Regions:
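Conserved SAM/SAH cofactor-binding pocket of Class I
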Residues: 1-48, 52
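Short helix-capping segments at alpha-helix termini
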Residues: 11, 33-38, 77-81, 105-107
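Conserved SAM-binding loop
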Residues: 17, 60, 87
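Conserved short alpha-helix immediately C-terminal to the canonical SAM/SAH-binding motif I
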Residues: 23-27, 67, 94
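A short acidic, Gly/Pro-enriched loop at the edge of an enzyme's catalytic core
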Residues: 49-58, 73
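Short strand-turn motif at the edge of the Rossmann-like AdoMet-binding core
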Residues: 63, 87-92
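A short glycine-rich, Lys/Arg-flanked "PGG" loop and its adjoining helix->strand segment in the class I
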Residues: 69-84, 99
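Core SAM-dependent methyltransferase catalytic element
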Residues: 107-127
């Protein structure tokens, strides 16, 4: 919810948010409605890319490294050329594993932010 709202407030025109947790989906929908963003943000329950139509310019996920590695092939298909995948929730020790999987799926690390043993990575899918 908070990532979808931030994307909307930063100018994204259409946002499809997905969370596996039913309560998180409920709360996200309420917060999005309260902030007047329902016309641009939809929230569904499911796995990361379940029900996302077409391709995206940006995909954002705050999940652990194992799941990021698992979904990278699907992200590669769902992300437009020159698109960006922002992945956070990665413990620093797993960053090399994520980078290896990213390269295997056609991504390049563009930026890495580290704080208190956690990492956020911006990956690019280039032409």
């Amino acid at each position: 919810g908070i990532l979808a709202m931030a994307a909307a407030l930063l100018g994204a025109k259409t946002i499809h948010a997905v969370d596996i947790d039913e309560k998180a989906v409920e709360v996200a929908r309420e917060n999005i409605a309260q902030n007047g963003l329902s016309d641009r943000v939809t929230v569904n329950q499911g796995n990361l890319l379940d029900g996302t139509p077409g391709q995206a310019d940006l995909i954002i996920a705050n999940i652990i490294a194992d799941i990021i590695i698992l979904v990278l092939p699907e992200v590669a298909v769902k992300l437009r050329q020159n698109g960006r995948f922002l992945a956070s929730g990665i413990i620093e020790e797993r960053l090399p594993d994520v980078e290896k999987a990213a390269k295997e799926n056609g991504f390049t690390f563009l930026d890495v932010k580290r704080k208190a043993g956690w990492c956020a990575v911006t990956m690019g899918k280039e032409d």
